[in-house]
């Protein structure tokens, strides 16, 4: 027992193991959450920082001391939960109690409008540089991570030559590599990997994001309005409404509603306007 205490208190491996156990217990639904027994209450502060087209907004969670600590920049992508979601707050507090300054970069276009805004990749590069420059951050121990499309953006941002050599680690949770595969899987309600294929019912947020990406390249405003009304707002369309769609509008509608096979989904995908593929 004494040896275990010494291992935890003195060695880097012991300290890491100890903090990891406390962190996991905090973020999972376990009856005992002991992080608060050993650390002060974290500070949560909204900050702003320059980005190419204006000002970025983020929430920073950190322990209330002046000790420079490791840090991570997180991007939740098209996050419908929002900044004050209990899960988001729990994650920020748990990471900061584990000794990691945690910065959540927020995108108004992606979070509020469920769009995929590639400008956020550049914004993440700027956000990383801002985080690295803070006095409460150890500049040689800064990483970047994300969830879903936010993870994809984080991976691209981390490879940017302006910050790549400074990125200590990357954590990507549920990123996707190929937008074509994502849309085809969502449209056919199946997911596949190599030779394995299984049914998949995509989350409404997934369909909402894809609907926004499809509708914004449709030339007909009535098509855009109908698809937005059905797949973003969750309303029903009448047979008359569907019959009034243009050919390209009907392509988008069928892709989002459901197709009979992946082959059909792929065929419809390649018939979408060129702007979508670009």
Regions found by a protein language model. Give the residues of each.
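N-terminal cap/lid segment of alpha/beta-hydrolase-fold proteins
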Residues: 19-70
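Structural cue for short, hydrophobic secondary-structure segments
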Residues: 74-77, 104-106
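Alpha/beta-hydrolase-fold enzymes
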Residues: 156-258
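Glycine-rich nucleophile elbow surrounding the catalytic serine of serine-hydrolase chemistry
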Residues: 146-156
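Alpha/beta-hydrolase active-site loop
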Residues: 115-136
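Alpha/beta-hydrolase fold nucleophile elbow
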Residues: 135-148
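Active-site glycine-rich loops that stabilize anionic/oxyanionic intermediates
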Residues: 69, 75-81
